[in-house]
Amino acid sequence: MPNLLLELRSEEIPARMQRKAAGDLKKLVTDALVEAGLSYEGAREYWTPRRLALDIHGLTARSADVREERKGPRTDANEKAIEGFLRGAGLSSISEAQVVNDPKKGDFYVAVISKPGRATEEIVAEVMPGIIRDFPWPKSMRWGKASSAPGALRWVRPLQSIVCTFGPEHEETTVIPFEIDGITASNITYGHRFHAPEAIMVRRFDDYAASLERAKVILDAERRKDIILHDARDIAFANGLELVEDEGLLEEVSGLVEWPQVLMGSFEEDYLSIPSEIIRLTIKTNQKCFVTRKQGEDTLSNRFILVSNIEASDGGKEIVHGNGKVVRARLSDALHFWKRDQGNLPDLETLAASAAKFGLDLQKPLDQRMAKLDALDVTFHAKLGTQGARVARIRALAQKLAAVTGADAALTDRAAVLAKADLRTEAVGEFPELQGLMGRKYAALQGENASVAAAIEDHYKPQGPSDRVPEDKVAITLALADKLDTLTGFWAIDEKPTGSKDPFALRRAALGVVRILLERGIRLPLLATTRDGDLLSFFHDRLKVYLRDQGARHDLIDAVLTPEADDLLMVARRVEALTAFITSEDGKNLLAGTKRATQLLAAEEKKGTVIADGVSPALFKLDAEKELFAAISSASKDAANAVAGEDFRSAMEALSKLRGPVDRFFEDVLVNDEDAAIRANRLALLRLIREATGTVADFSKISG
């Protein structure tokens, strides 16, 4: 079957946009072809810094013929209805319609519309200009003389050429020469900008990819990544070092080069006095280079690895030299930041009021930065006040939470006061992603308690489902205070996540609270802390996500979770106990019996029957009734006591004793007895079953 090759070649596409853009191109083109009546066997997208490419194989040569019958009005309908039918069906005269007889409804018109299939070339030429014009780039530009004209083409960078060929795998292909803003699709592409800028004629994907590789362009981004990673590891190993791998940087660098050449540079060892995180970010952010370390050690070396797009005749010496100069200049700046952050600020006399407010020691550099943060009235959020006000709120909340977590109150207070101080450091100003980490380092340098220093870094954690949860009690307390303050604040100003939009990462903050409470075994009544039922519901949503990710069944979570449940740890423990019980033989049988009882009660309640609150033993006629009543009385008491003692497994064990009596009751007893009093008493007995199991879960919500 025929294949379609498409290439959109432009000036350099930002690396961060390439993967998604290639995926968008694949989806837009294949969706349009399918909508036009074509089918295909497979499609794969490719990208380099200068091109998006698409290979669609097994594409049908033309769309199928379509025959459609469109029912019209009755033959005796008024003229207006008939005219509307003709317009809608595309008929010029009613004589072109067929008459169909319906014995019940009478004769009516039917238009038979036949649409012949279309050649794939025609369809592609029709859909591609619109796809290119409306392409969903996050940012795009106009260029050239035509850029000022209305409707001028916009692209991420100036679009230079288009390749579009179609044909069978082993035969000659044809060019589909659609045109857009003066660019006509052809079978001509170009290789590497510097090594092979000459025109290359291509036919289909196989020779296209091979021709590009001969022209120093590796089309497959995953291959470029593999080459970079393999060569970087090798060059590091050859120098007695190991590569510090970075998947994000690898993805970015592979989007900067079409012909990757891996080289090694160096800088003076004096710069290794800078924290390794700063060195790594400086080299990564500014030069897109990898750092290395001694084999088997955490300490960085003074060698870095860069990836060039040019196979230089001098083996890359000039490229390494140029990159080294820039790296050294950047590290010199970083060293300057690092040293300045450890020194005194020049305007200490203006910080006295802020220092007094937070109990700060202006002889210490980090304290000075916190005082400066407050004195400058740095805004946290327009509706939530300054960073200083935020720290004051976190500080007050942390003191309350310390009583729950068992954290040392004095250490918690000190950590809360210094938690945001590094926001005024030059290192964090240059690299915002180092907030918390730099605070920890500066805190250690000025002699803070280890728990305080750790809490300054860890109060931002966890920052996602795979991030670690704080372990130190002070860090746990501060992490909870920070996240709860953020959530209650944004809820108070009605800035809540909507759909896929969550600009303030509130879902992540709520999941962080859930993980801390559950993974560190903390009992915290959230309503007493947040005083917001809607926010509690938001926590419930995050709890459900977390528990499902841990393997819990959604129906068991729903069976346990009530709208007012604000102790999330207890909810999780109930779900755990219920899971173990409901998968046991006793649990399965009790569930079946309870569901039967619940269904009978629901049917009666739907009819308006009022179920009695109490049961009269005097009305028991059968031993099965007496046995069930006694079992419920005992199990209910034991289960309630176990729940009160938060021993949910024992509560389930107590309920398991109901299995036999419930089974025998339904085997031996007819609930709908002819005697109305006995019938009502038996319904009341069923109600006791529902109430007994309800002490631990709503069994009606459990599937099975």
Swiss-Prot record:
Top EC class for this record: ligase
Keywords from the named record: Aminoacyl-tRNA synthetase, ATP-binding, Cytoplasm, Ligase, Nucleotide-binding, Protein biosynthesis
Catalysed conversion reaction: tRNA(Gly) + glycine + ATP = glycyl-tRNA(Gly) + AMP + diphosphate
SUPFAM superfamilies attached to this UniProt entry: HD-domain/PDEase-like (SSF109604)
Location relative to the cell: Cytoplasm
Known EC number: 6.1.1.14
UniProt-listed InterPro entries: DALR_anticod-bd, Gly-tRNA-synth_bsu, Gly-tRNA-synth_heterodimer
GO biological-process terms attached to the record: arginyl-tRNA aminoacylation; glycyl-tRNA aminoacylation
Cystine connections: none
Location (main, coarse): cytoplasm
UniProt-recorded Gene Ontology molecular function terms: arginine-tRNA ligase activity; ATP binding; glycine-tRNA ligase activity
Pfam families to which the protein is assigned, alphabetical: DALR_1, tRNA_synt_2f
GO CC terms of this entry: cytosol
HAMAP family: Gly_tRNA_synth_beta
Quaternary context: Tetramer of two alpha and two beta subunits.
Family: Belongs to the class-II aminoacyl-tRNA synthetase family.
Protein's recorded name: Glycine--tRNA ligase beta subunit
Source species of the chain: Rhizobium etli (strain ATCC 51251 / DSM 11541 / JCM 21823 / NBRC 15573 / CFN 42)
Organism classification: Bacteria, Pseudomonadati, Pseudomonadota, Alphaproteobacteria, Hyphomicrobiales
